[in-house]
Amino acid sequence: MTYVDGFVVAVPTDRRDAYRDHAGEGWRLMHAAGATRQCEGWGDDVPHGTLTDFHRAVQAGEDETVVFSWIEYPDKAARNAAAAQIMAAPEMHDLAAAMPFDGKRMIYGGFEILVDTGAAASDTGYIDGFLLPVRDRQAYVAMATRAEAVFRDHGATRVVEAWGDDVSPGKVTSFPRALQLEDGETVVFSWVEWPSKAARDAGMAGVMADERMQTPPEGMPFDGKRMVYGGFATLFQS
């Protein structure tokens, strides 16, 4: 089963190019260790929420931009092996020392794929990213499976839902803190891939107007008031 490491980072806006280059160097190491794909999304349409949002998640300052990213592996065993190899690589120590962002505020975790429909495309131009506090896994999968068809009917090329598996509470920032996670809830890391921002804007309008999205399921399996979401322009992808 495909496994994902998910990340959210606050990057100084004027270090955008440095971050892209840094991600490329990181991918070279990750790919050699067994990762199959990496994608980095630069914050473009990231709203400030009332309770939670991506800015709060990483304590982003006014001079920083939120990045939403992930790395894919064939399975959890491959991910664990890659992590061990990377941590022992001298190049990784150099890369960590040169990070163009505050690593102490980066949030990250490991996730099992629940839903993965469509196909990853080398020309993905835009990403909608989501973090959700989910209480009922089975009900969430059923709801997400219905919804993914609507997104793809309106132009999305891929829809992924991933269930928190190796997600630490963190000391400064973390996925659980970002969602004000409660007992019995699990973090879901999710994204929708689009060919471009124009396709995303048109597609999301279609999704919102689609009759299939007008009737929510009885007993939503997550708290929508604490859901975190935003739109990201693709900055780097392997």
Give the location of each predicted region:
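Hydrophobic, helix-prone linear segments
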Residues: M1-W27, H31-A33
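Short, well-ordered beta-strand segments in beta-rich or mixed alpha/beta enzyme
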Residues: V4-V11, T50-Q85, Y126-V134, K171-V207
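Surface-exposed interaction/gating patches
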Residues: V8-A10, A120-R158
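Short loop/beta submotifs within extracellular cysteine-rich repeat domains
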Residues: R15-D17, K76-R79, M92-H93, R137-Y140, ...
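Generic detector of contiguous secondary-structure segments
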Residues: A18-H31, V66-F68, A139-R152, V187-W191
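Short amphipathic alpha-helices in soluble, non-transmembrane regions
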Residues: R20-G26, A82-P90, A142-A147, G203-E211
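A residue-identity detector for tryptophan
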Residues: W27, W42, W70, W163, ...
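Glycine-rich beta-strand-turn "strand-cap" elements at beta-sheet edges
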Residues: H31, R37-E62, A88-T124, R152, ...
